[in-house]
Amino acid sequence: MMKKIFEVQKPIIGMIHLKPLPGSPNYDKNKFDMNAIVKYAVEEAKILEQAGVNGLQIENYWDIPFVKGEEIGYETCAAMTAAACAVKNSVNIPIGINVHMNGGKAAMAIACASGAKWIRVFEFVSAYVSYTGLTEGIGGELARYRKMLDAKDIQLLCDVNVKHGSHFIVHDP
């Protein structure tokens, strides 16, 4: 699967950590409005591409404190789509989307709109406890959403035992 996206088996994926987006408690349009956020993302993308990474993952990393996937707002999706489209149009390497925290459906929608090649999902199966509370696996829901969008060309990069919390189950089946 990795060669399908990156043309190498073990890619180096650079991270584009977007500044706080509209809707985030830390968003300050006087300091970083959307034009500045997009400009910064594009500058970072070009630097990382020149450094030789094989792809770029765009994340709302500074939208802290994070909310669970089903609580992610439309404003986050809109802002991330604007940034992702600008980044994609400024580089010649593939991009992917990760929406904190476990926002697989939001990431899939953004990927469809922006032409991203993959999404990252923190918890595809099982459940874990993190600073956002109980986060449940979204594999079944995401598979159905992906089918509905006819997005089989968008790959899923999913964590197992994600670093962002402790698993809720006490015994693996």
Model-found features: residue ranges?
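Glycine-rich, proline-tolerant flexible connector loops at the mouths of alpha/beta enzymes
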Residues: G52-A79, V125-Y131
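Alpha-helix-loop-beta-strand connector modules within alpha/beta enzyme cores
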Residues: V8-Q9, G14-M15, V67-I97, E136-C158
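Conserved, mostly hydrophobic/aromatic
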Residues: G14, L48, L56, I119
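N-terminal small/glycine-rich loop or linker at the start of catalytic domains
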Residues: M2-D33, L149-G165
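Conserved anion-binding
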Residues: L21, K105, A109-P173
